[in-house]
């Protein structure tokens, strides 16, 4: 019988490295990104903004990320943009998961207590690489065994910060909806999106400081804090599920071949430079279309690994085997949970399925 283990999260991170950056080494993605950041122009001759903070090394990194996010969020494509929209809401949910686990009173490590660094790296390097490693550390921690309680004032702040987290993806997608696709404003919002996790965590700390006067530690109730955590998870899961169902509906009922199920979710190519196999497209220059294919392949592998990671992580926490040196044998109901999680992930997406599963798990602690 298949059994989840926390080591599988490390294997998934390795798969993420290969899917995101391994193929990119062979299929021309790195060369195209380097050319654009060097010339400061996209293949379709649109200018690329290169000044954000006045700090050279930081601006260089933000410029590179602007290329990546611009191509996947502008109005020149439909399918790749729709998948990327879905991914960002799944990642918003995983950010909430990490924040909740960081608030447990049993957490001693600053590495886990302030997860903004992991959220930033998910945006900058790919969630498929960073997220499995961070969740492995969460599962390896004995914080929940020591003291799983979240202080009430911190739990009460979670629904507020959940709303803020769910609004974050709009920073990068809204410009295309309002006619500012690919503009300097769009690039500035992309840069803001990269540091948004730090701002959000700072906002959360500020809100909890204010709430601490109204919810002192002495008023802590086990049942009281859980309902706020569950409400946050259900809110995030509902929004992410709606986004994923919207994506699936669009793929199933559209006549646009760029938004079909296989186009969205099934990786094609890999080692081959897409410019060699592209079908002529009068709407996109060949070099730009090749870059879009490079980045879409990146997104597809990001999606696959995030889905698998959410299933493994949720199953580990539901089965109460996280933090243990030796995993206990799986029992029949755990196999059933795995099947339910997998089906839910397909239908609701990793953000929705994982969030609802963790809301159930919260009641079991």
Swiss-Prot record:
Its main location: membrane. It is found in: Membrane. Its EC number is 5.4.99.-. Pathway: Polyketide biosynthesis. The keyword Heme does not apply. GO terms for cellular component: membrane. The chain crosses the membrane at residues 10-30, 82-102, 116-136, 158-178, 188-208, 233-253, 297-317, 338-358. It is a multi-pass membrane protein. GO terms for molecular function: isomerase activity. Keywords: Isomerase, Membrane, Transmembrane, Transmembrane helix. Induction: Expression correlates with the production of depudecin with high levels on oat grain medium, and minimal levels on oat flower medium and complete medium. Part of the gene cluster that mediates the biosynthesis of depudecin, a highly oxidized eleven-carbon linear polyketide that acts as a histone deacetylase (HDAC) inhibitor and makes a small contribution to pathogenesis. The reducing polyketide synthase DEP5 is the central enzyme in depudecin biosynthesis by yielding the backbone polyketide chain. The monooxygenases DEP2 and DEP4, as well as the uncharacterized protein DEP1, then act as tailoring enzymes to modify the intermediate polyketide chain into depudecin. Belongs to the membrane-bound ascI terpene cyclase family. This is Terpene cyclase DEP1. It comes from Fusarium langsethiae. The lineage of its organism: Eukaryota, Fungi, Dikarya, Ascomycota, Pezizomycotina.
């Amino acid at each position: 019988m298949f059994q989840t283990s926390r080591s599988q999260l490390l294997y998934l991170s390795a798969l993420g490295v290969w899917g995101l950056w391994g193929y990119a080494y062979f299929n021309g993605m790195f060369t195209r990104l380097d050319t654009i950041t060097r010339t400061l122009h996209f293949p379709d001759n649109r200018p690329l903004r290169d000044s954000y903070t006045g700090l050279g090394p930081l601006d260089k990194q933000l410029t590179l990320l602007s290329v990546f996010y611009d191509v996947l969020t502008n109005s020149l494509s439909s399918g790749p943009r729709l998948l990327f929209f879905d991914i960002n809401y799944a990642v918003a949910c995983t950010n909430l998961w990490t924040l909740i686990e960081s608030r447990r009173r049993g957490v001693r490590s600053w590495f886990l207590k302030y997860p903004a660094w992991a959220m930033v790296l998910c945006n900058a390097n790919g969630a498929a690489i960073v997220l499995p490693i961070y969740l492995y550390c969460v599962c390896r921690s004995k914080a929940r065994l020591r003291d799983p309680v979240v202080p009430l004032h911190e739990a009460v702040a979670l629904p507020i910060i959940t709303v803020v987290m769910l609004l974050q993806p709009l920073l990068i997608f809204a410009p295309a909806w309002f006619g500012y696709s690919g503009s300097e404003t769009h690039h500035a919002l992309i840069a803001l999106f990269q540091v948004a996790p730090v701002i959000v965590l700072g906002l959360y700390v500020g809100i909890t400081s204010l709430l601490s006067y109204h919810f002192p530690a002495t008023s802590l109730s086990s049942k009281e804090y859980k309902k706020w955590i569950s409400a946050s998870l259900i809110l995030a899961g509902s929004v992410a599920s709606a986004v994923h169902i919207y994506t699936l509906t669009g793929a199933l009922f559209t006549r646009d071949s760029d938004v079909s199920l296989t186009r969205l979710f099934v990786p094609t190519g890999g080692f081959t430079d897409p410019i060699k196999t592209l079908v002529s497209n009068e709407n996109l220059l060949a070099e730009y279309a090749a870059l879009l294919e490079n980045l879409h392949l990146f997104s597809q592998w990001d999606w696959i690994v995030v889905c698998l990671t959410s299933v493994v992580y949720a199953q580990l926490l539901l089965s109460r085997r996280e933090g243990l040196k030796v995993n206990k044998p799986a029992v029949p109901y755990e196999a059933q949970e795995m099947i339910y999680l997998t089906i839910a992930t397909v239908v609701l997406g990793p953000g929705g399925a994982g969030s609802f599963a963790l809301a159930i798990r919260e009641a079991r602690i």
